[in-house]
Amino acid sequence: VTTAQTTELDVQPTPLALLLLGREADPKSERGVECPGDLPSPSDPDLVERARAAKEKLGDKVFVLGHHYQRDEVIQFADVTGDSFKLARDAAARPEAEYIVFCGVHFMAESADILTGDDQKVVLPDLAAGCSMADMATAEQVAECWDVLTEAGIAEQVVPVSYMNSSADIKAFTGKHGGTICTSSNAKKALEWAFEQGEKVLFLPDQHLGRNTAVRDMGMTLEDCVLYNPHKPNGGLTAEELRAAKMILWRGHCSVHGRFSLESVRDVRERIPGVNVLVHPECKHEVVAAADYVGSTEYIIKALEAAPAGSKWAIGTELNLVRRLANRFAPEGKEIVFLDKTVCFCSTMNRIDLPHLVWTLESLAEGNLVNRIEVDKETEAFAKLALERMLALP
């Protein structure tokens, strides 16, 4: 269970000139996000100076984390950038920072709170910055799934493996039931470890990362995988299907990566002869199978860094990152385009904008703790256990 808190530390409250733009302060408000179109317009440039001034006033008391999918206007104020796990570890390595401002989404801030010290306070600039995929697996649904596995007589054979992109509750469930967490970079190692512990894996919440890793990296077949739908009785599966399966995949997906299609790949190859198609493993299996290269966000960045001048690339991942990489490598003559013709970005990531960041930094600078993300101790203990198992992977 996670609580989001707004606490006044000073009897003189900070004037909140920047409102929350009418958004609900509900981290679980985003479910099944549809593509909202092109990126929002840049925020008022006058806010840049306000953000800079507030950050300078806070000094070493604040450490700002910026996920790769954040807007440029926000990333410019990040002390470090990276994927969710790297950022959580970076925060833990800065114990002198009283405030960790996480420019990302809710589950990321939870992970940072789990890995940082008790005296550090993790803040999310907009509490409505949730994650539709993380919300696709609730603690109640996963507990019910475990009951189904128990009734099928296989629970003792199953090891849960949860993607980093999951809530603290799901990470805790995983830790409590002998499982581990994985990232898109180490999913193969996590599965290898899990199959040393048991005969089957319950992979959640992203079906595509689980399927792609099992088939592409582990040599399994699509028939070895079954899809558990939490909205159907018994997950829509028979006991016989569960007993025969090696991989029990949760019916969850990323709303952005799930939009890329086989048609997207075919179209870009027709439009740009000689293009290299590079996609994230959260994409559908047929997209991954049709791509030239597949890898995590960090893999994508390193691949483009190493790419020769004049090469052409179509990238299947979040739009903010693709645009940033296209601009970065344009002087080297590398042509980088978004894989799909329909422009789409992660709308929940983009809830963290410059007005919210300014409001957060100015509030903290005036002594007002806002939008704190705090995981309860029992949940934290089991979630940390699952994360520690991941850290111990070879």
Tell what function each PLM region has.
Residues 2-316, 320-394:
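Active-site loop-to-helix "anion-binding N-cap" substructures in soluble metabolic enzymes
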